[in-house]
């Protein structure tokens, strides 16, 4: 069972990392201002790291487990405030968030076969704080081997 779950996590990391790299590369090459290029470079590095972590995990290496754990921790938080925003997912995500507006309300979003990175100074007027439950579950599976 452990091997099947590790393979599933690895496949999602490889697919999401490759898709993210393929999506970001044209924007990286065509980005204009320096701050846009820096964010695209960070995105490219995160997707590359996740792809490498997935490949190493599929090879059943100890380094793959460690890198995949780091990748899952990077995908865990969802922070969107008027001052700063960060969210990263690669392959799939199930986000549970609390929208801090009057009245506060929970929010559930999910994506499969997709990638995304939100890294910005600034964000929505109604703050969102949440967790990627799929990343949390994957991290726990990797830690409780």
Region spans (language model):
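Topology signature of small-to-medium multi-pass alpha-helical membrane proteins
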Residues: 1-145
């Amino acid at each position: 069972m452990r091997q099947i779950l590790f393979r599933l996590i690895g496949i999602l990391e490889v697919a999401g990392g490759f898709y993210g790299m393929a999506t970001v590369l044209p924007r990286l090459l065509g980005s204009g201002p320096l701050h846009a290029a820096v964010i695209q470079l960070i995105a490219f590095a995160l997707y590359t790291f996740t792809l490498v972590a997935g490949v190493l995990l599929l090879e059943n290496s100890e380094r793959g487990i460690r890198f995949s754990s780091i990748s899952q921790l990077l995908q865990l938080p969802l922070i969107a405030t008027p001052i700063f925003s960060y969210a990263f997912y690669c392959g799939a995500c199930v986000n549970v968030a609390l929208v801090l507006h009057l009245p506060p309300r929970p929010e559930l979003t999910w994506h499969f076969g997709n990638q995304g990175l939100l890294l910005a100074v600034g964000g929505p007027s109604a703050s969102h704080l949440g967790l990627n439950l799929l990343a949390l579950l994957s991290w726990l599976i990797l830690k409780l081997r």
